[in-house]
UniProtKB/Swiss-Prot annotation:
InterPro entries: CidB/LrgB. This is Holin-like protein CidB. One of its GO terms (biological process) is killing of cells of another organism. Keywords: Cell membrane, Cytolysis, Membrane, Transmembrane, Transmembrane helix. It holds the Pfam family LrgB. Belongs to the CidB/LrgB family. CidB subfamily. The gene is cidB. It is found in: Cell membrane. The keyword Iron does not apply. It is a multi-pass membrane protein. The chain crosses the membrane at residues 4-21, 30-52, 62-80, 89-111, 147-169, 204-226. Increases the activity of extracellular murein hydrolases possibly by mediating their export via hole formation. Inhibited by the antiholin-like proteins LrgAB. In an unstressed cell, the LrgAB products probably inhibit the function of the CidAB proteins. When a cell is stressed by the addition of antibiotics or by other factors in the environment, the CidAB proteins possibly oligomerize within the bacterial cell membrane, creating lesions that disrupt the proton motive force, which in turn results in loss of cell viability.
Amino acid sequence: MNEYLQAVLMILLTIVLYYVSKKIQDKYNNPLLNPALIASIAIIIVLLVCGVSYKGYMKGGTWINHVLNATVVCLAYPLYQNKKKIKKYLTIIFTSVLTGVVLNFVLVFTTLKIFGYSKDTIVTLLPRSITAAVGIEVSQELGGTDTITVLFIITTGLIGSILGSMLLRMGGFKSSIARGLTYGNASHAFGTAKALELDIESGAFSSIGMILTAVISSVLIPVLILLFY
């Protein structure tokens, strides 16, 4: 098959399956029917049935990645709209995100050390709550396995976006600041997309939570590894 045609088909496949998955979620309003999860499973099934390799899919997937990188800039819009509120609560925002990052590191690092996992495994799994673009770089720089890092980043994001609403309701969190920061800190881009579905203010705080988590983590992970190894 012509490479250009295959790329176009893979792009169309992704868009159509995501659109259908989103319609299914809208109809049944079930958090388990996450469109990213359903679309991913559907794409895998189609690729397996049609005998298309990952390399073949990425002929179109690469272009989607380029578009996604550009759409990150759009996250600046809700930040701009809520700049006064963000400035007002900046200390609380930074403290909350820093606490979340540290607790995540302590939990992951301690658990893996107790079970005797190697440095490479620890480095691979520590960036799981960072947005993929930064998490992959951190993992590669410190000797982790980036493909496994990506898997855990996606899994973490999906779990957070699926269970986030339920956990926030159970915890009684109704503030857009609390909801947004929780989504951004725990489940990066997936969580931010979910927060934007709630309201634009939650999306803004999720965006800043995601950004701060990436920045703080990219500084603290190398320091943590340096201290213990």
